[in-house]
Amino acid sequence: MLLPASCEVAEIRFSEVGLMTKTTLQIVKEMEQALERAEVDCSEYFHDDFDWVANFGCGTKRGLDEFERAWYKPFRDAFGDRHFATEHYLEDGNWAACFGHCEATHHGDFMGIAPTGKRIKIPYIDFWRVEDGKIAENRVSVDFPAILAQLGQDIFNGKGWDQLDSKPPKNASLSFA
């Protein structure tokens, strides 16, 4: 089909019964907004048995109950006023990905670190797999060295390889220290 250059084309997906469904990216963005609002019940966005697989320090959570108890609630308690600043999203079929940071004030215990009252940026990268309109899997990487540096703890004792950089990044939003 040929369209004039001024027309915008919107992607519409239909389920097997012909009803319009949400895209993978729409589901992920709505979930992110719900987490920012500190919604207690995440079942609208996640399968009960979804897998949350993350880097060292975050762990692996099997199922929604474990995710809410062992990641979402402690994170929400430590950083209650958070705002997600996702910089880029990608979508490929039933997978979506993003990177960005969460801006938050350190109000509660964070992995043994007493509240500092500091406003920090929490860098993250996420990959989600959506099945039947809900998130079935989330693979995430949280930049703990950047978080700890902002909270006054340098785990590299001044010997991190970022010390070898000749210039700061062009995009200031990528600088977290």
Residue ranges and their predicted role:
Residues 7, 11-177:
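C-terminal and inter-domain tail/linker signature
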